[in-house]
Design a protein with these regions (language model features):
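Residue-level preference for short coil/turn positions at secondary-structure junctions
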Residues: 1, 54, 67-69
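Core segments of cupin and vicinal oxygen chelate
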Residues: 2, 9-53
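Vicinal oxygen chelate
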Residues: 3, 5-12, 31-35, 46, 63-87, 107-112, ...
Length: 125
């Protein structure tokens, strides 16, 4: 097993708002994906499936609710997570943990997204 995690889903209440938020702070495109469930909106983060990269999505459906409780998803903060973190507030989120040094493991930070989820960033710089 190369990765303990291979997929994550972040629940959202407003798909378009969340898609814009994550696209803005991470400077990437969330790709709309058709799911057979008619009452579901699904948008995938880019990932390298050929090299067993970890992927994920934002999901709007009634059975999934945004939360600050539970597991924390750590998104790739790039070379320096301050770049993404600096966009959180202007994109509609709230920084709840600034860039924090975790020794040889790099840096982490946490924020509340536009949907009310507690999400984190990780980078080595």
């Amino acid at each position: 097993m190369k990765n303990a995690i291979n997929w994550f889903e972040i629940p959202v209440n407003n798909y378009e708002r969340a898609k814009k938020f994550y696209g803005t702070i991470l400077d990437l495109e969330i790709t709309d994906y058709h799911m057979p469930e008619k009452n579901m909106k699904y948008g995938m983060f880019p990932y390298d499936m050929e090299n067993t990269g970890v992927g994920g999505a934002i999901v709007q459906m009634k059975e999934m609710k945004p939360s600050t409780d539970g597991a924390t998803v750590y998104l790739n903060g790039g070379d320096d997570l301050n770049v993404a973190l600096g966009k959180v507030a202007t994109a509609g989120g709230q920084v709840i943990m600034p860039k924090t040094d975790i020794d040889e493991n790099g840096f982490i930070a946490q924020f509340i997204d536009t949907e009310g989820n507690r999400v984190a960033l990780h980078s080595m710089g």
